[in-house]
Amino acid sequence: MLDLKLIRQEPDFIKEKLATRGVDPADIDALLELDAKRRELIVKSETMKAQRNTVSDEISQLKRNKEDADDKIKEMRQVSADIKDIDAQLDTLKDQVQDAAAHLPNIPNDNVPVGLTEDGSVELRQWGEKPNMDFTPKAHYEIGEDLGILDFEAGAKVSGSRYLYYLGAGARLERAVYNFFLDENTKAGFKEVLPPYIVNDDSMYGTGQFPKFKEDVYQLKDEAMTLIPTAEVPLVNYYRDEVIPEEELPVWFTALTPAFRSEAGSAGRDTRGLIRLHQFNKVEMVKFCKPENSWAELEALTKHAESLLQKLGLAYHVITLTTSDMSFTAAMTHDLEVWFPEQQTYREISSCSNTTDFQARRAHIQYRDENGKLQYVHALNGSGLAVGRAVAAILENYQNADGSVTIPDVLVPYMGGLTKITK
């Protein structure tokens, strides 16, 4: 949520910055018009309430003097009726202002590349050697099916498209990957959390999924409850409507959860394999910190996510997304994209974002500074990492000509000493 006071004071700045994210300046004008009407009615309501108090005092005085107060009583009833009408209008306007503001994305940082598409993202760095194979690499889903460790056909039979079964060494590899991620995250100072997988609408609003992105998630019928699209939702909302003691900042959380996504608008994209599923495991990282530290925290978050890929020996690059390609809540996003030999391209495996005070305003998460003044924290989030995509990257990058897959060294202890998956 943007600061409404800032929008009032610097409308041209807001229009210019949000235009780079595809926001029509007319939307800002419409919000300001609603806000002006609301503020005007607030003044009118307060004036009439003061008038009602004055008339009430006059009625009391007339009654004490045993004088006729009928006219004043009629006047007060009319004023009270007018106040009730104005307050009803105010309630409506408040909701309209809130809704209009809730649809505006975060202000992009000045260092974010401007672009209305993903084209224009800036590569920051590359790491690792892409595997040099003397055979034609297979896609991860072909490898998994040939080894009997991934069963997409059974997933489609039981649940539909974009679901699967992990079997045998495949299930163990998935478990090895997320346990490795969690162990590395906790070693780095993150507190492990096991959160709820179903959250209420206030939580979805707090992290910015609602009201704009309801079509992207699975909601429970006849209940204001949603299956989480990411652990970011329950982790950020842990502190919703709370004041974090200053001495506890920064707070670092990590969690493994399933993520449930409808993938609305993704028809025809990545229809095979582990890249785009309706249900997948993801290890998430969330940080809360003071505003002055959030950009350093973003770099540290990104570097830590990179370290996971480095320990797995997977080649990747880091890019800064354009203004329109980064998430709705982000002021800046660094994507980590891992190399897929069969596709001969990089694919996203982590997004690390600084949401500044955007989520904190929506979720009312504050801390009290050294002067005793309440301030909004800055919240950051990043995948650490997407588990299924990591499994896919391992299958493709560690495949052998005979169809087997070598286990990365760091995962061998998690695989019970298994060094290779074979038929």
Curated annotation (Swiss-Prot):
The keyword Ligase applies. This is Serine--tRNA ligase. Belongs to the class-II aminoacyl-tRNA synthetase family. Type-1 seryl-tRNA synthetase subfamily. L-serine binds at T230, A231, E232, E284, S383. ATP binds at R261, S262, E263, E348, I349, S350, S351. GO terms for molecular function: ATP binding; catalytic activity, acting on a protein; serine-tRNA ligase activity; transferase activity. Consists of two distinct domains, a catalytic core and a N-terminal extension that is involved in tRNA binding. It catalyses: tRNA(Ser) + L-serine + ATP = L-seryl-tRNA(Ser) + AMP + diphosphate + H(+); tRNA(Sec) + L-serine + ATP = L-seryl-tRNA(Sec) + AMP + diphosphate + H(+). GO terms for cellular component: cytoplasm. It is found in: Cytoplasm. Its EC number is 6.1.1.11. It comes from the Bacteria. PROSITE patterns: AA_TRNA_LIGASE_II (PS50862). InterPro entries: aa-tRNA-synt_IIb, aa-tRNA-synth_II, aa-tRNA-synth_II/BPL/LPL, Ser-tRNA-ligase_type_1, Ser-tRNA-synth_1_N, SerRS_1_N_sf, SerRS_core, tRNA-bd_arm. Pathway: Aminoacyl-tRNA biosynthesis; selenocysteinyl-tRNA(Sec) biosynthesis; L-seryl-tRNA(Sec) from L-serine and tRNA(Sec): step 1/1. It comes from Levilactobacillus brevis (strain ATCC 367 / BCRC 12310 / CIP 105137 / JCM 1170 / LMG 11437 / NCIMB 947 / NCTC 947) (Lactobacillus brevis).
